[in-house]
């Protein structure tokens, strides 16, 4: 999970999710794409 100021989809399988006021990008196909906005 990378913590970045600016998050976004990196492939077609990434999903943008909001949890507890934070923005996450979750990707099951390529876990390297997992990000959290911080």
Swiss-Prot record:
<dbReference type="InterPro" id="IPR035977">
    <property type="entry name" value="Ribosomal_bL36_sp"/>
</dbReference>
<dbReference type="GO" id="GO:0003735">
    <property type="term" value="F:structural constituent of ribosome"/>
</dbReference>
<dbReference type="GO" id="GO:0005737">
    <property type="term" value="C:cytoplasm"/>
</dbReference>
<keyword id="KW-0687">Ribonucleoprotein</keyword>
<dbReference type="GO" id="GO:1990904">
    <property type="term" value="C:ribonucleoprotein complex"/>
</dbReference>
<dbReference type="Pfam" id="PF00444">
    <property type="entry name" value="Ribosomal_L36"/>
</dbReference>
<protein>
    <recommendedName>
        <fullName>Large ribosomal subunit protein bL36</fullName>
    </recommendedName>
</protein>
<dbReference type="GO" id="GO:0005840">
    <property type="term" value="C:ribosome"/>
</dbReference>
<dbReference type="InterPro" id="IPR000473">
    <property type="entry name" value="Ribosomal_bL36"/>
</dbReference>
<comment type="similarity">
    <text>Belongs to the bacterial ribosomal protein bL36 family.</text>
</comment>
<keyword id="KW-0689">Ribosomal protein</keyword>
<dbReference type="GO" id="GO:0006412">
    <property type="term" value="P:translation"/>
</dbReference>
